[in-house]
Curated annotation (Swiss-Prot):
Region (Interaction with RNA) residue spans: 129-134
Record organism: Clostridium botulinum (strain 657 / Type Ba4)
Single GO cellular component term: tRNA methyltransferase complex
Binding-site residues for S-adenosyl-L-methionine, renumbered to this chain: 43, 68, 101, 123
EC number(s) given by UniProt: 2.1.1.33
Reactions accelerated catalytically: guanosine(46) in tRNA + S-adenosyl-L-methionine = N(7)-methylguanosine(46) in tRNA + S-adenosyl-L-homocysteine
Pathway: tRNA modification; N(7)-methylguanine-tRNA biosynthesis
Keywords, alphabetical: Methyltransferase, S-adenosyl-L-methionine, Transferase, tRNA processing
Gene field: trmB
SUPFAM superfamilies: S-adenosyl-L-methionine-dependent methyltransferases
Protein name (record): tRNA (guanine-N(7)-)-methyltransferase
Amino acid sequence: MRLRKKWWARPEIEASDKFADEPKELRGKWNKKFNNNNDIHLELGCGRGGFISQLVEKNKDINYVGIDLKDEVIVYAIRKVKEKEEEVKREFKNIKFITMNIMGIAEVFDKNEISKIYINFCNPWPKERHNKRRLTHTKLLTEYKKFIKPNTEIWFKTDDKELFEDSQEYFKESGFNIEYITYDLHNSDFKENIKTEYETKFETMGMKIMFLKARLL
């Protein structure tokens, strides 16, 4: 589904201190941007911010960067964080958002700058000629390895079984060890799950969610 252009979105996100409008200039300087030396975690394809806003609230000593392609999506993620701030009556200084094509992500983060990556319900790109666009594909995992620290974990959730099984091979081929895996997350023994908007919707439909944790060797 193609998003309708919202002309008001760009001015709104640029007015927010949660938005980094020149991310390439921050390469190697993200801790300075956050004004601390805390670990930095990424959510790739953060959508409307339901997931990352919960992380930011729970973990004030971790910095987060949410990435999505469209201004029309990020604007709602910023609003979601503001809503959460109002709810808990506390300003979150540990979150930034950027809009970009993730294919160019290694231009934004430097070696050993990132400590964890979350990938939730990304586009499965089912046609074989489009597989390289998958956020878990070996092509992109190679890019992530340019800026993640040793032993970094990638947490991956999806409702698409073909993507999930292909991704297991992508991780193994790219030098990651799969440390946890389940084909039914909500009925598993994994207790650290935070639900996304999609996940809550899928749960009401009785759909099973697949999840894995992969660690860079």
